[in-house]
Structure formats: C-alpha cells, structure tokens
A protein has these predicted regions:
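N-terminal nicking endonuclease/strand-transfer module with a His-rich metal-binding environment
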Residues: 1-274, 278
Length: 283
C-alpha cells in the first residue's frame, strides 16, 4: 500500500547534536569530526543502498566530499546553539523498484532543493522490516546546510535585517535610540509555505511515477482528516516500548498498534490498490 511520510527538522548544536554525526549515520560511513575531535563510525549500519551529494553548479568540488562539507558547516557556525542543517525524512514506495525509488529521490532533490540553491546530502535506506507482519519502510534522508553557500564562493548569511519604517520611510527607533529591525531569512527555506509546496511536489512526483507505471496506487500529502478518511488512532508507545520494539521484543502496546495499523491499511486498500512491480505491465 502506498504511504506518505514527509518530515523535516533541524540539526541543532544547542540540542547536543552534530551534523557530522548525522551525515555519518545516514550514509553508513566513518567520518571524523574536527569540531569535537572525535570519529563517528556507522560502517556496521546495514540498509544504506545509495548516497550522493548534489550541489548547485557554482559550489566547488571540495564540498562534494561528505566529510569536508559537514566539517566546514560545523566550523563556520560559531554559536554554541547554532542550527546546522535541515534534516528531511521522506518515505519511498514498496510498489516501486529500488532503482525507481532512487531516481525519484534524486530527481526530487535536484528539482526542489538544489534548484533553490541548497546543497543536498542524499541517502536512500531500504528499510527492511524486522517483523514479518509489518511492511518494509524504504525511505530517504536529506541533510542540507541551513547557511547558504553563495555564488561568489563563500558561506553566506542566514539572516538579514529588515528595518521597521514609519509612513515616510524613515527608520523607527526604540527608547534607546537604536533602529528597530526584524531578522529575516536570506533564503526563505524555512518558510512554511515552501514546506507545503515541497510536500505537494513530492506527492505529484510519486503519483506521476505511479501513472507512468500504470498503477492505481496514489499518495496524498493531506492528512487523512483533510481527505475525509476516518482511521483508528494508535496508542502512544513511549520511549520504553519503542526501545523494546526496536530490539525486536514484542510488547502489548506494540501488538495493539500493529493490529490497528493493519486494520487501517486494509481500509485504505479499499480506496487505493495496485499490483506489485513483478505483476504490472508497461506499455
């Protein structure tokens, strides 16, 4: 069954996170972190089937090296609470082949992220399920520096000042005589409307592929509620339950949630059905 998931968060030093570690994790590689003087080794991680760094044409070749790229990002950010990168987690489709999923991810990143001037660290994970009663979870990760790299070959500013003006166009000052201003993004990458556009664009990209393959499956970036579909909500699992389930230890709450998801999937399958990659035919 075709499923939709598209989430984005920020990798933040203020939360004790490091983007070099994040990059090592999604790529399944061993990377040295200059900022902290330590190595992050995820070479034993399984399931990473494709990685690539995509950049605008003006970005120098050195930044296509993963370790170099993310160490530069760590170095240029001076604040102890710096926001380092956007981190995307996007579901791929079991109905499609691995090669089709990879090409979808690459094309989407080029069209929606790189086209906006973003440097993209892409990693595709096959997401093999550990439980026989749960489907595989193929997905891809994207890390993108929050600070832009400019066409003149340097790391640019994240924000700029927009001064508050009066009716005559003069700057308004505060009680201390200082100009009042708002700090705004230089890129617009954090604009909620742009995120909505990315979600919609991914939906269209996947559904276009389904149509090309003569498949009835479709995804929808809208919530089930917005689509008018009533599903049974799952039960909150909490840290301990999730940790046990991750280790392959089945729990009562986990079993209940699996049953709920299975019922919901059966319900949705009445609305969206498609043949497997092996069974479909192409004209």
């Amino acid at each position: 069954m075709a499923l939709y998931h598209f989430s984005v968060k920020q990798v933040s030093r203020g939360k004790g996170q490091t983007v070099v570690n994040s990059a090592a994790y999604i790529s399944g590689q061993k990377l040295y972190n200059d900022y902290y003087g330590q190595t992050h080794d995820y070479t034993k991680k399984s399931g990473v089937v494709f990685t690539e760094i995509l950049t605008p044409e003006y970005v120098p070749e050195r930044l296509t090296d993963r370790e170099t790229l993310w160490n530069e990002v760590e170095k240029v950010e001076k604040s102890k609470r710096a926001q380092l990168a956007y981190s995307f987690d996007i579901a791929l489709q079991n109905e499609l082949t691995l090669d089709e999923n990879i090409e979808l991810a690459r094309a989407f990143c080029r069209e929606q992220f790189v086209a906006h001037g973003m440097i993209v660290d892409l990693a595709v994970h096959e997401g093999k399920s550990k439980n026989e009663d749960e489907p595989d979870n193929p997905h891809f990760h994207v890390l993108a520096p929050i600070r832009p790299f400019t066409e003149d070959g340097r790391w640019g500013n994240k924000q700029k000042r927009e001064y508050v003006l009066d009716e005559d166009g003069n700057r308004i000052k505060d009680a201390k005589g200082k100009d009042i201003f708002n700090a705004v993004s230089t890129t617009g990458w954090n604009d909620p409307e742009l995120l909505k556009e990315w979600r919609r664009a991914w939906t269209e990209k996947v559904n276009e592929k389904f149509r090309e393959c003569h498949m009835a499956a479709r995804i929808d970036h809208r919530s089930y509620k917005e689509q008018g579909i009533d599903l049974i909500p799952t039960i909150h699992e909490g840290y301990e339950v999730r940790a046990m389930e991750k280790k392959g230890i089945k729990t009562i709450i986990g079993e209940l949630n699996r049953a709920i998801r299975q019922f919901n999937q059966m319900f949705i399958c009445l609305l969206y059905t498609s043949p497997s990659p092996r069974d479909r035919t192409r004209s």
